[in-house]
Every structure is written in structure tokens, then in C-alpha cells.
Amino acid sequence: MKNTLFHRLKRPIAAAFVGALTTLAFAPYQIWLVALITPALLLILIHGQSRRQAIWTGYAWGLGQFASGISWVYVSIAGFGGMPLAANLFLMGALIAYLAIYPALFTWSYQRFFAKATLLNLLLAAPALWLIADWLRGWVMTGFPWLWLGYSQIDSPLASFAPIGGVELLTLLLLVGAGAIAYAVIHKRWSMLLIPTVLLSTGYGLSHWDWVTPQPDKTTKVALIQGNVDQNLKWLPSQRWPTIMKYTDLSRENWDADIIIWPEAAIPAFEVELPSYLSNLDSAAKMNQSAIISGIVNQAEDGQFYNSILAVGLTPYGDYSFDLTERYHKHHLLPFGEFVPFESILRPLAPFFNLPMSSFSRGDFVQPNIVANGHPMAPALCYEIIFNEQVRQNVTDDTDFLLTLSNDAWFGRSIGPLQHMEIARMRALELGKPLIRSTNNGLTAVTDHRGKIIASIPQFETAVLRAELTPTQGQTPYHQLGSWPLYIWVALSLALAWWRKRRTNA
């Protein structure tokens, strides 16, 4: 009986281990080749399994991947949730168990419809089904597209495909390569290993191609203020003015910058409470031929709260006034952090469901760029930068930079902020726009239009990042077309693989 149980569990156990190894492909480890090997091992593990066996193998792979890959979420739950250890572990386990459903959906659907390890199934059907599972994970219940495999390739030769089809194209190419490796191992057809080799070589060749044109005549000096404010103290009434003056004093030392940027919710007060201060800040920035961008919390006349971005100083908005139509309001809110699903049921249960600032309203999906000192910027607040389609649709022909403000203090010294930066870099590469990322305690950095970090400052330090950024002109294919070519590819691949299967079985 023990031998039978071990026989049943050995593949799921192996899958969980392989899934956990996948985290090594992402920041801060960035062993990008792992993202090619671990999906191949998953395809090999489900070979010859029944649908029921495959679903558990895929689920175990997902448990391993997300238990290791999003372990940083526990830092926030334990540090700010106000619940006992058992409740913290339960919530973390529930999140991991939910996310593992999507790899299980992939393995079940593959074994259900394309069980045979044919070349067509592994190179077309498997990548298509993987993308569908990823899309569902990025959409269901507001979506959580973290750890999409393509993000791990930001520094690999495959990164050159990102301006063509975005991070999803990189995921597709990884799965095509993984399918070829699995086919080679299962059928001992080692010539199939040429496929991932060709993909990587093609990516290297594409790295010399630039889809957009830099505009050196519009080079801009920016100063990013990293306040390093303790999250436990930030919203205490006694800390309001010390925090505000900290950012103000650091800005005064950098008035020679064209644009000074503060992080998400840098001002620990409602905008409506600070009209005199903001008016004076606006005047000071104008006097110094500069502009300041900051995250701030807003309350509208109807009582709704917004996580917002404002710009003062040299802007097209005129003298400072409390006008919410001239602000960017965060659209994609963080579940439980900025809104609570099933609010009336969950809020009374535990402090975790009643965190400060967890009743925000959404801004529009597409909003005007923030303009500072003549430079339009496509904004994304914190978590929004992981939603590629939202960022893409907010970039216009006039956009000079991508702007993302964040506060990753919730996640301490975990790997979460490093993965967050990795994702932000991908947005710059996809859209061919330099990226400005200003945070409370790191990672604060700027990148060029290829997603390469130009300058950064260490985490957990009060510091100012000075850099010069060069805007670009033109559009990448991904900016123009989005993911539609991939949707078509997925449909055609599944249709072709299904037709071939029916013809073979006839």
C-alpha cells in the first residue's frame, strides 16, 4: 500500500519541486534558462497520465511555483493584518491554493483534448492552452498576472521579442521551446533541441533592431525622492508634517531638475486638507522652472476616495486648485488593500479586511497623461504596472515616459519589490518608452526605452535619484496591435491541432 501511495504521489511531488524551482527564473535570481526547462519538465511529467492524474500534477506544480514565488505576500499579511499566526497561514495557503488552479487547468485541458505527445500538440496546442490559463489568471477576480513566465526573460535574448508581442509572446516562445525539449526527451529526437536554440539566436539577432527613435533634443533631468518613511508611522497624525517636510526639503535641494517625483501617497493627508501648502509648493516649483509629481489620497464631494497622482509647478493646469478632473486616479485597485470584495461580510471578521485606505473607488481605464514641464507621461500606480493592456492603452503618440509610483514598504525585504521592478522594466521594453519608477523605500529606478536600468538607489535608504532621460518617437508593434495577433495565433493553433487529431483518429 505504501508503495502504491508513493507511486501515485511521486509525480505530483516532483512537479511541486519543479514548480518551486521556477521562481529562480525571476528577480532577484534571474536564472532565465530555468523558465525554459521547468515547463518542459511539467510536460514530461504529465506524459502518459490520465486527466485526473494530470490535473493533480499540474496543481502540485502550481503549489510549488506560487508558494515560493509569491512568498512575499505573507510579509504584508503577517506584518499588517493584525491576525494570529494560524489565520495568516490560512490566508496565504488559500491564495496559493487558488493560483495553483491555473496550472492545473492547463494540464487537465491538455490531457483532455491533446493527450498524445505529438509535435503539433507540444509546439502548438500546449503553448496556446498555457496562454489561455495565463489570460484567465490575469482577468478572473480582477486578475493577478504576476509570475507570467515571460517576465523572467527581461535580460535574456528572448527579450528582443517583447516590442513585437509583449510579455505574452515571450511566454509563448518559452512554451514552444519547452514543448520541443519535451518532445526530444519523450521520443529521443534530439534534433528538436534546435528549436529553442533557433529561438534564442533569433532573439539575439533582433536585439540590434530599434523600433523607436530616441529624441536627444528632449533629454530631461529628473529627481526621484525616496523618503523611506516607516509604514507603521506614516499615517499617524503626529508624523504628517515631518513626512511632508522631509519630501519638501529634499525637493528644495534639487530644484535644478526639470521634474521632481515623489512616490505613491507620499503626502499622508487628503489633498483637500492642504490647499495652502500645495499652492505654495506650486509657486515654488514655477519659480524654479520645475514641476513636482506626487501620489496623494483624494476625497471627492460625493464622499468617494481615490488613490491619485497630481502635478504642480510647470504644468498645463495653471495655478494650483483642487480640481479632481486634473488628477490621475488609480483604476486597478488591489484586492483587500484598496477595496474589499464582499465588504459587508469580510470587514467585521479581522483587521486584515479593515486596513486603512481600503475603500477606494476606481478611476477610468484610460485617462489623460500627466503632463509636467512639457512632458506627457502615462501613469500607473503601484500594482497597475503589472496590467500590460491597461498601460498600453494609456500610452499615446505624445507620451514621453512611463511613470509608476509605488510604495512597496508593505513587503519589507522580500523578493516582491524586486519582481515588481522586473515587471515594470518589461513595460518599458514592450512600449519603447523610458520608465520612471519612484517608490517610498525601493526599488527606485529609471530605465531606458529597452528596459535597461540607467540608474537606481539602494532600498531602505532616504535618498534622491538624479538621472537624465531621453524620450522616444514612434511605436512598437506591440503598442500598435496589443495582444490581438496572439489571440488569433491561439485560436488557429488549437483549431489546427484539433483538426489533426480528428484526422489521425478517423
From Swiss-Prot:
Transmembrane segments: 26-46, 66-86, 89-109, 113-133, 166-186, 192-212, 479-499
Keyword terms, alphabetized: Acyltransferase, Cell inner membrane, Cell membrane, Membrane, Transferase, Transmembrane, Transmembrane helix
CN hydrolase domain segment(s): 225-471
Gene3D superfamilies: Carbon-nitrogen hydrolase (3.60.110.10)
Molecular function terms, GO-annotated: N-acyltransferase activity
EC number: 2.3.1.269
Active-site residues from the entry: E264, K330, C382
UniProt-listed Pfam families: CN_hydrolase (PF00795), LNT_N (PF20154)
Primary localisation category: membrane
Entry-linked NCBIfam families: lnt (TIGR00546)
Protein name according to UniProt: Apolipoprotein N-acyltransferase
